[in-house]
Design a protein with these regions (language model features):
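Conserved SAM-binding loop
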Residues: 3-122, 184-188
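S-adenosyl-L-methionine-dependent methyltransferase catalytic module, highlighting the catalytic core
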Residues: 89-105, 109-187
Length: 188
């Protein structure tokens, strides 16, 4: 089983797409999900215009990932979190990573990416509106706001808290974005 955690408006084919908001697919079979793949993760171009459309998307399950996850230990093949960890506080992130590590099978993958804050500053220093939008998000609601930033070093420390071990942690691009990001894969 593969989980797409905090999926937002992106419905990833072949994954159980979970978020705290959205229409659960069985409840609204009439609604066509924004279904996509890693190769075309974002089917819409980046839009800097604030909108109130957060809950108008389809998910498979509504899950609060800040509570104990329902999946048993060592049962999940892959967990994907794209542009999501920065939407949680540092302490919430600690809990989320703990749950991800718990549910992943040995050899299971945690695929992630998040904004590259330093490169964002470098590229958008002269465009304050875009800089603020990329750093803090659009703040349509409590979920659509950035609460922390990471770099490779701080994210690696987060992954290894409480002596968690990973067979490998590799930083690489996992999804194409129109703005600077840091991505990677951690293998349990």
């Amino acid at each position: 089983m593969k989980l797409h955690v905090a999926c937002g408006e992106v419905y990833l084919k072949g994954y159980v797409n979970i978020d705290i908001q959205g229409f659960v697919r069985q409840e609204n079979a009439w609604k066509d999900p924004n279904e996509t793949t890693f190769d075309n993760y974002y089917t819409k171009p980046l839009d800097f215009t604030p909108k109130d459309t957060r809950a108008n998307f389809v998910i498979d399950e509504r899950v609060n990932i800040l509570l104990p996850w329902k999946w048993k230990d060592n049962t999940i093949d892959e967990v994907v979190m794209i542009q999501a960890m920065e939407h949680f506080t540092y302490f919430d992130g600690c809990y989320i990573v703990k749950e991800i590590h718990r549910v992943l099978k040995p050899g299971g993958k945690f695929v992630f990416d998040f904004p590259d804050i330093i490169e964002t500053f470098n590229q958008y220093a002269n465009d304050f509106d875009k800089l603020i939008r990329l750093l803090y998000c659009h703040y349509r609601d409590v979920f659509a706001a950035h609460k922390i930033g990471y770099n490779e070093e701080t994210f690696t420390r987060l992954l290894k808290l409480e002596n968690r071990t990973w067979s490998s942690i590799e930083f690489k691009e996992v999804v194409k974005h129109a703005y600077p990001t840091i991505g990677g894969v951690a293998v349990k």
